[in-house]
């Protein structure tokens, strides 16, 4: 409740709306971070885009609808075959995956191998945050969050393949033909290889939930942007 009051007041101030919540209504014993930059930063993710025209709202709405439909390709995909992940986005994720390997190379073998996954997950989050910080566009940020969820599902088939090593790898050949792959090494190092299929499925559904949550967030921001545009302007 305390956090909600702080966020509500911050959002109202950003949108020009008055608030009838007095400072003394908020418990003086709340954590200090609720009044600090962290609360202000998080609250920015709850502010709808300002001055979004009707055409822009329609275009964003169509995009979110398409992403909602596309999400089910990955949510319902079989992590044992990876057929659902052999599309355009897999190639995009692969670019940042390989960049992550290079970036983490100085930090030892485990981090070097894990760096591929970290790289492909970090870039969508950077996009999400950049939309909010640089443009105040929470609808655009929701697309970045959707990409993060999709990139997480992109890891799932390789996690599930840690023991079988049947998936084709970059450059040709399967993991069995090329001494394994990233997640074969990572799960064996952590002693989790016997749970590869379970972990792969868990990662897939977690990513799918994030994708749907991102679409819901974007839809909510669009609805609030529409409500703000319909509100009479005080003169």
Which positions does each model-derived feature cover?
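Interfacial/capping segments of alpha-helical transmembrane domains
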Residues: 76-92
């Amino acid at each position: 409740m305390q956090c909600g009051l702080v966020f509500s007041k911050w959002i109202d101030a950003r949108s020009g709306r008055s608030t009838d919540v007095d400072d003394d209504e908020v418990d003086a014993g709340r954590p200090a971070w609720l009044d600090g930059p962290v609360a202000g930063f998080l609250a920015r993710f709850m502010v709808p885009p300002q001055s979004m025209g009707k055409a822009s709202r329609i275009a964003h709405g169509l995009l979110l609808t398409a992403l909602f439909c596309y999400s089910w390709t990955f949510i319902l995909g079989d992590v044992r075959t990876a057929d659902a992940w052999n599309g355009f986005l897999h190639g995009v994720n692969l670019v940042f995956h390989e960049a992550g390997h290079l970036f983490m190379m100085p930090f030892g073998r485990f981090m070097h191998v894990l760096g591929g996954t970290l790289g492909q997950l970090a870039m969508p989050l950077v996009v999400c945050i950049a939309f909010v910080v640089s443009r105040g566009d929470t609808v655009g940020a929701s697309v970045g969050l959707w990409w993060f969820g999709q990139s997480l599902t992109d890891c799932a088939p390789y996690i599930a393949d840690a023991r079988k090593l049947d998936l084709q790898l970059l450059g040709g050949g399967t993991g069995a033909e090329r001494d394994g792959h990233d997640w074969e090494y990572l799960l064996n190092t952590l002693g989790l290889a016997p749970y590869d299929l379970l972990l792969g499925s868990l990662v897939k559904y977690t990513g799918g939930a994030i994708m749907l949550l991102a679409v819901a967030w974007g839809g909510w921001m669009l609805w609030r942007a529409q409500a703000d545009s319909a509100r009479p302007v005080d003169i």
